UniProtKB/Swiss-Prot annotation:
Pfam families in UniProt: Response_reg (PF00072), Trans_reg_C (PF00486)
Record note on modification: Phosphorylated by wide host range (WHR) VirA protein.
GO cellular component entries: cytosol; protein-DNA complex
Gene3D superfamilies from the UniProt entry: 3.40.50.2300, 6.10.250.690, Winged helix-like DNA-binding domain superfamily/Winged helix DNA-binding domain
Keyword Cytoplasm: yes
Protein name according to UniProt: Regulatory protein VirG
Described function: VirG is required for the positive regulation of at least two vir loci encoded by the Ti plasmid of A.tumefaciens.
Annotated DNA-binding residue span(s): 141-241
Record localization: Cytoplasm
Keywords tagged on the record: Activator, Crown gall tumor, Cytoplasm, DNA-binding, Phosphoprotein, Plasmid, Transcription, Transcription regulation, Two-component regulatory system
Main location class: cytoplasm
Amino acid sequence: MAGQDPRLRGEPLKHVLVIDDDVAMRHLIVEYLTIHAFKVTAVADSKQFNRVLCSETVDVVVVDLNLGREDGLEIVRSLATKSDVPIIIISGARLEEADKVIALELGATDFIAKPFGTREFLARIRVALRVRPSVARTKDRRSFSFADWTLNLRRRRLISEEGSEVKLTAGEFNLLVAFLEKPRDVLSREQLLIASRVREEEVYDRSIDVLILRLRRKLEGDPTTPQLIKTARGAGYFFDADVDVSYGGVMAA
């Protein structure tokens, strides 16, 4: 039975954008999610995909990894560097741990393997909407300054002292915010899994280690001897630097 149409409560339909070169799969997803009160756009290639992203508001993205001549992971990477929209990966075969780590590192938030049940797929869409990063919803105006860096939450931009921008995936961005909100507090891997907004049952502790390594490579002069993100052996990680917070350009007291 379909859920109540949000339009009856004066709310717009949530928009799901799907990229899959399988015509039958596109039709199935569009038909099923439409019945359950979603707006669905299904496309076959990255050109159409980017056109929709540029012209419409999208709440969840579903990317098939097996796109023939195109690389689904590259689409995930590109999207995650410029948007916090949740990304669900679908694959024709069950992903190995290493593939999941790579996908998480690039910015995916969930996985589902073909063939999958439509009810499970619907549930994952709804979960993705619930855990969408709050930064986008609240338009957080905070900026964090630390060491030689500034992180602007509203614009999702990490800027060096020289003024150059360093791109962050959604997972890297969320982890960095978690550290900056609690400088020098030890955060466990479980806390970091929650902060990165990925499903715990779909990942392994090592995926957090990979994200940490990526952040160190972007922030640290020598990532092998980190000065900012340090390891608390057996406990997790902590951010070892003073952090200043400003709100819309006004420094917090």
